[in-house]
C-alpha cells in the first residue's frame, strides 16, 4: 500500500471514531450580580452572593437575588460569618448610630454555631484577645484595624478556620450596603 492510500485509510478510521453530537444551547438564568462590601481584610471578602448550602438553613431567600446579610467565608471553606453590622466599629455596642456589632458565626459541622468558640485579635498580634461564643454574638473589640477571628470546634476531631474583618475607629458610622 502506498503512503497516500495509508494516510487516507487512517483519516477515514479516525473520522469514524469521533461523534458529531449536536451542540446544546445553554440558556442563562438571570441572577443578580454578587457585590463585595467593605469590612473584610487580609484576604477575607464580604459579599451578598449565595453562601454555601450548608450555611443557608433558617434563611428565607429568593433564588437569584442578593443575600440579605453580607457574609464572609472562612479559610477552610467550612465557616461563615454573617455580618449583620455591615462593618464592625471599635469599642462597646451600641455604636454611634444605635446599632450593634452583631455577627452570626457558623461552622459546617455546627451550622447553628453551637460548640464554636471564636478568638479575635489584631492581625499579626497576640494581644489583646477577645473571646466570643459561636452563633449570634455581639463582637466588641477595643481597637480599630484588621482583626483575625479564629473559629474552633470539635466534631470528629479539632477544627479551626480564620475570618479577618476590618474594625472601624470608635465613633465612625459604618457604611450602608447599596
Task: Outline where the language-model segments fall.
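C-terminal motif of bacterial Sec signal peptides marking the signal peptidase cleavage site
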Residues: 13-16
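Bacterial signal peptide processing site
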Residues: 18-20
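Contiguous segments within soluble domain cores/interaction surfaces
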Residues: 25-142, 146-178
Amino acid at each position: 500500500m502506498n503512503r497516500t492510500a495509508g494516510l487516507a485509510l487512517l483519516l477515514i478510521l479516525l473520522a469514524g471514531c469521533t461523534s458529531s453530537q449536536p451542540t446544546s444551547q445553554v440558556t442563562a438564568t438571570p441572577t443578580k450580580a454578587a457585590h463585595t462590601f467593605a469590612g473584610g481584610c487580609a484576604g477575607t471578602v464580604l459579599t451578598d452572593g449565595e453562601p454555601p448550602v450548608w450555611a443557608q438553613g433558617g434563611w428565607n431567600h429568593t433564588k437569584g437575588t442578593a443575600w440579605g446579610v453580607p457574609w464572609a467565608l472562612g479559610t477552610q471553606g467550612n465557616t461563615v460569618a454573617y455580618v449583620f453590622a455591615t462593618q464592625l466599629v471599635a469599642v462597646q455596642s451600641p455604636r454611634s448610630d444605635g446599632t450593634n456589632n452583631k455577627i452570626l458565626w457558623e461552622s459546617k459541622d455546627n451550622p447553628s454555631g453551637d460548640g464554636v468558640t471564636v478568638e479575635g485579635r489584631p492581625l499579626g498580634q497576640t494581644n489583646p484577645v477577645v473571646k466570643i461564643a459561636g452563633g449570634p454574638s455581639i463582637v466588641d473589640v477595643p481597637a480599630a484595624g484588621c482583626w483575625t477571628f479564629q473559629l474552633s470546634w470539635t466534631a470528629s476531631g479539632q477544627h479551626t478556620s480564620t475570618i479577618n474583618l476590618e474594625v472601624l475607629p470608635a465613633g465612625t458610622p459604618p457604611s450602608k450596603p447599596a
